[in-house]
Amino acid sequence: MFNVGWFYDGEEIVKDKIPFNFKKHPLQRTPPEILGLEYKEVKPKLVISRKKTNIRDKYVVIAPHASSHAKYWMHPKGWQTIIDYLNEKGYKVVMITGEPLGDEWHDSKLGGTLTGVINKTGYNIDLSDRMIDIRDAELFIGVGSGLSWLSWSIGTPTILISGFSYPYTEFKDCERIFTLDYKACTGCFNRKWLDPGDWEWCPDHKDTPRHFECTKTIKPDQVLLAVNKLLNIY
């Protein structure tokens, strides 16, 4: 019997259970390494209801929240700029995170309460309904969260915004947005050990003006270039 996962004790990898440093490779590489198989990126086979979304007209799904603050896109006007642009181009924007829109604390992490979106946030929506909304969307835009992985698995064109992890960490089949500022601090997930109890975790620059600069320095124009490419907007 094989035990498959990321095994570590404190800040030390348990070498007799996992033969390599999983932080230096794509997350998907862990199972084949432990099982002695050739690594290749594989999407899971998902069974999705044939039911159609109840959203009329063409739309884009966004999922700006995540389980760690370090995963957020921290540009203060980033998400609203993307929403306004998509609305201007005739696309509805659907927000699908569990974290509720209109909650002051959660909204503060996004630069304020986002406007111009169809609100499908909340923890009372079934995963099957999330999958339908993602499947029928023209595009998904998210951060390093489970919903981005779900979109990729479903096959919806996906934009993933992250500076917390290096681009090789997640999956190749997406538009991966990473800061163009070569001086910015990046990739703490791959270099350090996350403290899940510290919401403001930023191991190199917490409580300084450089706090979360890995995504503060990702400009909306970078994301819009990927949006235009995937939606064929010229």
Put a short name on every predicted segment.
Residues 1-234:
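Catalytic machinery of carbohydrate-active enzymes
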